[in-house]
Design a protein with these regions (language model features):
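Short, flexible turn/loop "capping" segments at secondary-structure junctions
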Residues: 3-5, 71-76
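Short beta-strand/turn micro-motifs at beta-sheet edges
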Residues: 1, 64-71
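N-terminal beta-strand motif that seeds the catalytic metal site of vicinal oxygen chelate
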Residues: 1-19, 81, 146-147, 151-170
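Vicinal oxygen chelate
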Residues: 15-19, 76, 81-137, 161-170
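A short local loop/turn or secondary-structure capping micro-motif enriched for an aromatic residue
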Residues: 65-68, 100-102, 146-149
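Core segments of cupin and vicinal oxygen chelate
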Residues: 14-57, 61-62
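Short glycine-/small-residue motifs
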Residues: 56, 139-140
């Protein structure tokens, strides 16, 4: 058995323009600034939070001469960052908020799983995807299925459990 990790603590991103990214993450996603650290070379790190933890997201300006957008979104090391909202109502409000802010979706809204996109391995979550100013892929989701006992299901058992979830039996 490996390390007993409780949760992902935070995600740190290199950004091309701290002010632009800061506006996006505060005005569009609702982050709050915990603190900002400017370094003598002019680079900066900003700690952002969604709740009462010190930080959930860290924005760091790229070192001088580094273009964080040089690699396209598919070549980057972070595939996506997913943000959970409380429920379907919060999901729909988030969708409307992004639309009002002019953020274009790259996928969704959709439901992952047999009741939505047909994926037997899907989570049952409602999701939509969009990019931040540097092209990082972001997801907002709600209603992810929980896996009993934290164990992986065999595929057939998983499909049956998913159907039970869809039917409101789980």
């Amino acid at each position: 058995m490996g390390i007993q990790i409780k949760r992902i603590g935070h995600v740190g991103l290199l950004v091309s323009d701290v002010e632009c990214s800061l506006r996006f993450y505060t005005e569009v996603l609702g982050c709050k600034v915990t603190n900002r650290n400017k370094r003598p070379d002019g680079s900066e790190t900003v700690f952002l939070r969604f709740d009462d933890w010190h930080h959930d997201l860290v924005l760091s300006s790229a070192p001088p001469g580094v273009d964080v957008t040089a690699a396209g979104p598919r070549e980057r090391l972070i595939q996506q960052i997913a943000f959970e909202v409380e429920d379907r109502d919060a999901f729909l409000k988030a969708l409307a908020h992004l639309h009002a802010k002019g953020v274009k979706l790259i996928n969704g809204p959709l439901i992952h799983g047999i009741e939505g996109d047909g994926n037997l391995g899907g989570s049952g979550s409602r999701s939509f995807y969009f990019h931040d100013p540097d092209g990082n892929r972001l997801e907002t989701f709600a209603d992810m299925m929980r896996v009993p006992n934290g164990e992986e299901f065999p595929r057939q058992e998983y499909a049956e459990a998913m159907q039970a979830y869809v039917n409101g039996e789980r």
